[in-house]
Amino acid sequence: MKEIIYNYDNITEDDIDRKVKRTKIILENNEGNILIVKEFDAYQLPGGHLEPGEDFNTALVREIKEEAGIDLEYKERTPILKIRYLKKNFPNKDENTAFIGYYYADKLEPQPDLNKLNLTFMEQNSNFELGYIHKDYIIKELENNLAITEYKNTVSDTLEAIREYLK
């Protein structure tokens, strides 16, 4: 598994006060289309934050059901990518945070009903869209999106995961 660490503040693990964990997945259907979320103006993979007591795979199953209406099978998946951001004084002064994201990949069968979503209030109010982009075009779409979005880290992380998956 590839791991990327962003630590612009040069803080150590001992400096971390809290950890925010999230899990995302690349889901490819039989036609080579990859399920993608567009929220605000940023492309990203479906997934989200872990709730207390959840492991990464449990959170992944829950998030995919909420965001995409897909009953993803619970199984031990091996991540293809881990991205960590270590941030000093975030979100508050004297609080250092580690953002830890694990990225997985799986085949998508059967085709989900994209109209059966259980979105959070925030997702409902963020122009949340779910759709497909073919794997032959997704890198270019993400690069184009990266050039115009305010959410550069989100799109950049998605691009890293897709590149890792497609290599």
Residue ranges and their predicted role:
Residues 71-82:
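A short coil-to-beta-strand element that immediately follows conserved catalytic motifs
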Residues 43, 112-167:
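Nudix hydrolase/Nudix homology domain
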Residues 29-67:
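Conserved Nudix-box catalytic region and its N-terminal flanking loop in Nudix hydrolases
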Residues 7-16, 88-94, 117-120:
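Short, P/G- and charge-enriched loop/turn segments at secondary-structure junctions
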Residues 85-117:
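Active-site-adjacent beta-strand/loop module that shapes the phosphate/pyrophosphate-binding cleft
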Residues 1-24, 30:
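Acidic, metal-coordinating catalytic segment for phosphate/diphosphate chemistry
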Residues 27-30, 105-107:
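Active-site beta-strand termini and strand-to-loop segments that position acidic
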